[in-house]
Design a protein with these regions (language model features):
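Hydrophobic alpha-helical segments, chiefly the membrane-spanning helices
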Residues: 1-317
Length: 317
């Protein structure tokens, strides 16, 4: 039964990603909004709903490792694997706003997470803990950063399409239907994969950072790859960056307001990888001409993710 959940869940995710991408692109055309802004807001928040549901449920149940590990693992997965694979399909160009605002914003959010989760290292407490006040600060930062990012992206505004690809009510239904399929499909996948992993005796922390994070990030993976395949690269990049901001500031901020989150088996090394996931794309943007993420750099990012997961597994072997 678990295998059927995994297969059916994956199928729903793929179908949902296609429908969501089409609907979102239609909305962008209708209002003359850039694909990046749509990816940063509607698509990013929608595809991060599985992370929100899983982490919120884990926080309520007192499983800090699952709540934090899901977000940490998802952010690492989003950048290194998703952007890496997207770049392998087709090089991803960085816009001026990406370099000046969007990537630095993700870096700042990642550094904020590192600081608030390092109480013991900074001598502020006996354990590394994300408290309610810190969570509220992160939550408010998300609202402010999204408003600023959308406003600063106005210069990327594109012309309204003379003949939109679909009617507005159809586009709205496509977005809603796609999001529902993504959330349900991801949930089925996570339940099936987690059940299989637990039967093998794997720890909650490892499950959260790897299997659960990968499962809840399937919407981002599917929607980003479909966007790139359709030539909507701005939406793919906005989806990943927006999802990472949402995961750190909104999800962890909100969860820690529900109950303080303690880092158990989740280490500072894991959170440092989240910071590196914001630094490396920024570095790659300036390594070669054109300010884009090319196939070689994409392959390097995929290799980094594979190496990180291999290291995690080796720690419990």
């Amino acid at each position: 039964m678990d295998i059927l959940y995994i297969i059916f869940g994956l199928a729903l995710v793929l179908v949902g990603a296609h429908i969501l991408t089409e609907g979102s692109a239609a909305v962008a055309e209708k209002f003359g909004v850039s694909e990046f802004v749509i990816g940063l807001t509607i698509v990013a928040v929608g595809t991060s709903m599985p992370e929100f549901v899983v982490s919120s449920a884990a926080a309520v149940q007192g499983s800090s490792d699952m709540a934090i590990g899901n977000v940490v693992g998802s952010n690492i997965f989003n950048v290194f694997l998703i952007l890496g694979l997207c770049a392998l399909v087709s090089p991803l160009p960085f816009t001026r706003n990406n370099i000046r605002f969007d990537i630095p914003l993700v870096f700042i959010a990642s550094m904020l997470l590192l600081v608030v989760a390092s109480d013991a290292l900074l001598g502020l407490g006996e354990v590394n803990l994300i408290g309610r006040i810190e969570g509220a600060l992160m939550f408010l930062c998300y609202i402010a950063l999204i408003a600023w990012s959308v406003r600063s992206s106005k210069q990327d505004k594109q012309e309204v399409a003379a003949e939109p690809r679909m009617k507005m009510w159809v586009a709205v239904l496509a977005i809603l239907g796609g999001l529902v399929a993504l959330v349900v499909g991801s949930r089925l996948f996570v339940n099936g994969a987690s059940s299989v992993a637990r039967s093998l005796g794997v720890s909650d922390a490892l499950i959260a950072i790897t299997l659960v994070a990968c499962g809840t990030s399937l919407p981002e993976l599917a929607s980003s790859l479909v966007s790139v395949a359709k030539g909507q690269k701005g939406m793919a990049l906005g989806n990943v960056l927006g999802s990472n901001l949402f995961n750190i500031l909104f999800i962890l901020g909100g969860c820690s307001m529900i109950t303080p989150l303690t880092l158990g088996d989740i280490t500072i090394i894991d959170i440092t990888m989240v910071v590196m996931s914001a630094v490396i794309p920024f570095i790659f943007a300036f390594t070669l001409k054109g300010r884009n993420l090319n196939r070689i750099e994409g392959a390097a990012m995929v290799a980094i993710y594979v190496g990180y997961v291999a290291w995690l597994i080796s720690q419990v072997a």
